[in-house]
Amino acid sequence: MLAIVFIPFHVIHKFMTVPVLDMGSKLSIYPIILGIGCYFYQAFKKRTTWIPKKYVYFVISLFVVQFFSTVNGLLVFPYWSSINIDQFEKLVKLVSLIPNSDSILNQDSNIIGIIWLSIKIIIKLMFNFLTTYGCSLWIISLYIRCKENVFKYFYKGIIGGALLCTIYSIVEYVHLFGGIWASIILTKINPLFYDVASSHNWWPPLFYGNRVRSLFAEPAYLSTYLSIAIPVSIYYAMVKKTSNWLWKLLPVILIIMMLTTNSKTAIGILIAECALASLLLLIQFRKLTSKTYFKKVIKNGIWILCAVIIGLGCNSVLRDRYSIDYDVTNIQDNHIITLKIENTGWMTWNDVENYQLTAAWYDKQWNSFGRVNVTIPQTMRKGDTAVLTIDLPKLSDYEKYSNVVIELQKFGPYETGELAGQGANKLTLNIEDGHLIPLKDLQNEVVDMSAIASTSNGSNQQRFGMMRVDYNIGKEYPILGVGGNDLKQAYVISNIPDSLKHNAEVKLWIQSQNENGIFKSSFPVISEYPHQFAVYGTLGLIGFLIPSGYIICQLLGLYKKWLHIDQELFWKVFSLVVGYFGLMVSFIAGTTMQLYLYWIMLGTMISLLLSIKNEIL
């Protein structure tokens, strides 16, 4: 149960991470390693595995595919000349202990680096399989031995983690609605959960603007977690006998949290889960006339509808958390700008949080020069105005820099950063006929969670772009892929289209890899499905999808045992199936390695199939 409760703590401090493992940064790794270790001890002691052989054979087969893919990837890797000892900190420390290490580093640096990388990748593959698919097999073995206790602890673990997220988010909402005391609390406790800005010097951030993320590093991860937590909490509210109103309140809060992540992943999950839930309820509705069934559907439907309405309202309020109006009153010598600003939003700009106007010259590629920050010297409530003067560097000509952008930012002791993504408009000026003139159009960069298919809104540009990069890499090696994520990093930059290289976040990833090397700074995995195609080819992608296809086929084959007979069994299957479907949808914009959720759910779903066959849940 602890492994499930710990799922939200997916980016622990570096000194706590388990080396070699991709899942080593998750707090859940500790109880899972302990559980798998106990399993091996008991299996060796009793000379049995408890796991149906077909599942063991499948995992072994998938491992063989990925192993050969990795070996093939090492053999065809075209960038060996760029590999040396300096890219591996632990190897440098190890070689430094050897006498005459300087001569070794100078003469055999490339060969030693190649051998080290090859061994590291193969060992990493073995341990990753043990803690991912091995985790799923371990859960199946627990079901074989403990039966219904597996589901009881699964439900309690999800509910326990959801309660932790809810308690945290109460403080988070106070912060988002302007409570300084909540900002102070979060400033103190967030660094206790993870190393702030440990990756690329900004991720995970201390705060995430106007978006709810709870205990997770970013809102999309919370959405992925809630894909399971919401259906499970609804089921729990239906079966819990004591304090029933309290358990009905939990899914309402979780749905509100899902909608206020302002995440496209969230809206995609909700649409997918609602569609499947409606289909299952419609099929059940046609077969049953039980008043109890109708009562449950109507009561819970009302709760869910209320939650959606409240969540959409909160999303609308938080999405436009800041609003500002600019009135340029004077421009001197094309660089001294006097303007009146008005706070037109509901959020108070407290002077202790150090609100500023930031301005800079920009070229045609929107690279900045001569940035100037001017502090707003007073607390500003809705309707308050202030007059500020911005003195930009004077330019001798405007061939390169011909645009000026002014925007609101916060540079306080708790939260920092530009506020354009939270509703505050930007003011753009440009040079026309030798004079700096303000434009009427104001740029607004608010992220819209409903813009799922947009190629430019929010993070969609780099998301769709990097998915295309993975697809292009997979096309070059369509059968076995390039042999794992570590090797894939060397192929990424050469496959990034020029149009994507101008994206700010992609530019940061490219710069980091160019400065630190291929294996010290990696591109994040954006989407599981094209990633599987890129790293393990068509065989690996099919192997990844087989468990989900097997679950679907088995559920369809067993539908007479769970869809029309016992209502309690139906609701249990309903919650897990809807949640699992939403989780698989989330991998369009996420990966299985972000949270420990998929591997636990995979074992739970196989256990569900076994329990349906035995009509015991």
Where are these regions (language model features)?
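Alpha-helical transmembrane segments of multi-pass inner-membrane proteins
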Residues: 35-36, 126-139, 151-287, 297-302, ...
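A membrane-periplasm/extracellular boundary helix in multi-pass inner-membrane enzymes
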Residues: 75, 167, 173-180, 203, ...
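Terminal connector regions
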Residues: 396-431
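Interfacial juxtamembrane loops and adjacent helix segments
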Residues: 79-112, 178-211, 435-460, 486-529
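A conserved mid-to-late transmembrane alpha helix and its immediate loop/hinge
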Residues: 218-220, 466-467, 471, 477, ...
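Transmembrane alpha-helices of multi-pass inner-membrane enzymes
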Residues: 4, 8, 31-38, 270-281, ...
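Intrinsically disordered, low-complexity Pro/Gly/Ser/Thr-rich segments with frequent PxxP/GP/PP motifs
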Residues: 369-396
